[in-house]
Design a protein with these regions (language model features):
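Short metal-binding segments enriched for Cys and/or His
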Residues: 195-207
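C-terminal structured interaction module
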Residues: 180-182, 200-201
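Short helix-coil boundary/hinge micro-motifs
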Residues: 1-177, 206
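Cysteine-rich micro-motifs
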Residues: 183-195
């Protein structure tokens, strides 16, 4: 049976009683607050990558991906006011999710997409209040792809997508949500990553 979940209204309204932090085991490795609403899922997904400072790839194989999904899928669906079981993920699913993660990484770092192409599919439905909702489709990695691209779409319409960034410190590379008033941050933590990069530059110059 197809697993479905209401993503929420087209304006991206999340359940007001839910905390997006509960769906962020990967992001919590960095010690940061989650991104607002459903965008927390996208940031969380990107922060599953290997980090020399914070741990292994949480999508490294099917078992790791399944463990990650067991936390994230129910928490995300609760954030959106519904209830689902996490999709089953195999080694193949984990590999496809890593490919998807690379694609999203490219978008954040300015990779040119090129010709328009299909990246996923969702279903539209009316909820009990008459709001249009998007519903992830597919099984395994396709379910996550559908949910993640839906959240990207909602954040682009809400004007928050441009605040999702990748730290410029190569040793960190975490995905962070820029909360600065002018959206000018380039480090996830200006107190640690900023000085590290400044010191590296000084060493290269022999200062």
């Amino acid at each position: 049976m197809k697993q479905q979940s209401k993503l929420g209204p087209s304006v991206g309204r999340a359940s007001q009683s839910r905390d997006p932090g509960s769906l962020c085991p990967a992001t919590e490795r960095y010690g940061f607050r989650p991104a607002p609403g459903g965008l927390a899922l996208v940031r969380e997904f990107l922060n599953t990558r290997t980090s020399a400072q914070h741990g292994p790839d949480l999508l490294g194989d099917g078992a790791r991906a399944q463990s990650w999904a067991a936390h994230v899928a129910p928490a995300w669906s609760a954030l959106r006011g519904t209830n689902i079981s996490p999709p089953t993920l195999t080694n193949h699913d984990a590999a496809r999710l890593r490919d998807l993660r690379d694609t999203l990484d490219g978008l954040l770092t300015g990779h040119v997409v090129g010709q328009r192409h299909v990246v996923g599919a969702v279903e539209l439905a009316l909820d009990d209040r008459g709001d249009i909702c998007t519903m992830p489709t597919g099984h395994g990695w396709r379910w996550f792809s559908s949910a993640i691209w839906s959240e990207v779409l909602l954040s682009q319409h809400a004007g928050t997508w441009q605040r999702l960034k990748q730290c410029r410190n190569p040793a960190c590379r975490s995905t962070f949500y820029d909360r600065s008033w002018n959206n000018s941050a380039v480090w996830d933590n200006a107190r640690t990553c900023g000085p590290q990069m400044t010191n590296q530059g000084a060493n290269l110059l022999g200062i």
